[in-house]
Amino acid sequence: MSTAVTFFGQHVLNRVSFLRCSKEFIKKSLNHDSTVFIPFIEGEALISPENGDLVQLSNSVKSYKNILSAIVPLYTTLLNTTRSRSDESGINVTFLGLLEGTDSAFNFEWSNISYKGTPYFGLDIRVTESTLFKKVDFEPIFSYPKVTRDHIFKQTNEDASLYSQGKMYLDWLAKYKFCPGCGSPLFPVEAGTKLQCSNENRNVYCNVRDARINNVCFPRTDPTVIIALTNSDYSKCCLARSKKRYGDFVLYSTIAGFMEPSETIEEACIREIWEETGISCKNIDIVRSQPWPYPCSLMIGCLGIVQFNSKNEVINLNHDDELLDAQWFDTTEIIQALDKYAGGYRVPFKNDINLPGSTTIAFQLINHVCENYKNLRKTSSSHL
């Protein structure tokens, strides 16, 4: 498997996940002068109207300092209580990690080890007339434009990766408000990275509250397989067009689908390939992965190598009604398109067909096929 960095997947922060349980650490990091907050409004981040960058709140900007001084000290008193719930407070807050190697004076001692860096938090603003915090507490950022996909794909991978991490945690906090075991309100603990049932009545059984560990109190990530289909010499690549429209352009891409319970990555790939295209493929290699914050997927990028025998490679779209078209394309044609690609959300291919742009794992998988084809040709030529 490749360790190449994908968009949204850059290692930016040391998450120091073992420190989230320390209330002292969270209090100190929330209130430190160097701390940075990435604000979201109703689940979406903001773009600076001045320079188009992802908005990050810190005390170095006066208007942002006014916001932080109004909310952070009060929110700190709500930590690990039901009053911190966004329905009551008007905000969700989650600790993202420490940006190491900065000139921040933040320092925390834990087990005789010193942890240093700039603390980063995600902040989702969901204020109403009845919440503790009000809209006026967050002026002027309520007038800022919200991030669109077009915006985020123009950001640096560092900022996009911070955005992705914050968005996934905050989306989860916003969606899961009540305990599936007893219906009581859930409230965030461990700096917004875990949810806890608020039911204190021990006469009421709750399999969430009483379990030593369970999977509803932690953030969820949905594993999704995405596969570039090729043949044994990489001279062909199967690309498909979904019936879903993506703007006013024609997009052909790789095969993708959610994994199902009790399914291996390889079996999920084999199933998705057959269900969507009718192609029989048994040879699956895992290539690389990409976080995808829409809303909380982990794209597991794979290569499917089809043994052509006039049967395996035959396309049949009649199983699943998801695709509009699927075709085997010559890899040489794709290479020509990638060679001309100058960046952007999509790659012009042939006729009116476009391929996914470089911020997607689909692009990297398609490029992986092309590079394997070129390398195989070089090896063959060297033996002549």
Curated annotation (Swiss-Prot):
Q: Which Gene3D superfamilies match?
A: 3.90.79.20, Nucleoside Triphosphate Pyrophosphohydrolase (3.90.79.10)
Compartments annotated for it: namely: Peroxisome
Could you tell me which InterPro entries the record lists for this protein? NAD-cap_RNA_hydrolase_NudC, NudC-like_C, NUDIX_hydrolase-like_dom_sf, NUDIX_hydrolase_CS, NUDIX_hydrolase_dom, Znr_NADH_PPase
EC no.? 3.6.1.-, 3.6.1.22
Question: Which reactions does this protein catalyse?
Answer: a 5'-end NAD(+)-phospho-ribonucleoside in mRNA + H2O = a 5'-end phospho-adenosine-phospho-ribonucleoside in mRNA + beta-nicotinamide D-ribonucleotide + 2 H(+); NAD(+) + H2O = beta-nicotinamide D-ribonucleotide + AMP + 2 H(+); NADH + H2O = reduced beta-nicotinamide D-ribonucleotide + AMP + 2 H(+)
Q: Which residues bind Mg(2+) 2?
A: E272
GO biological process per UniProt: NAD catabolic process; NAD-cap decapping; NADH metabolic process; NADP catabolic process; RNA decapping
Q: What positions does the entry give for Mg(2+) 3 binding?
A: E272, E276, E322
Which one of the record's GO molecular function terms can you name? RNA NAD-cap (NMN-forming) hydrolase activity
What keywords are annotated for this sequence in UniProt?
Hydrolase, Magnesium, Metal-binding, NAD, Peroxisome, Zinc
A Pfam family hit = NUDIX
Positions with a binding annotation for Mg(2+) 1: A256, E276, E322
Cofactors (names): Mg(2+); Zn(2+)
Residues forming the motif Nudix box are 257-278
Residues annotated as binding Zn(2+) are: C179, C182, C197, C206
Additional facts recorded:
Present with 846 molecules/cell in log phase SD medium.
Family in the record: Belongs to the Nudix hydrolase family. NudC subfamily.
Assembly and partners are described as:
Homodimer.
Known role: mRNA decapping enzyme that specifically removes the nicotinamide adenine dinucleotide (NAD) cap from a subset of mRNAs by hydrolyzing the diphosphate linkage to produce nicotinamide mononucleotide (NMN) and 5' monophosphate mRNA. The NAD-cap is present at the 5'-end of some RNAs; in contrast to the canonical N7 methylguanosine (m7G) cap, the NAD cap promotes mRNA decay. Mediates the hydrolysis of some nucleoside diphosphate derivatives.
- Specify the protein name: NAD-capped RNA hydrolase NPY1
Gene encoding the protein? NPY1
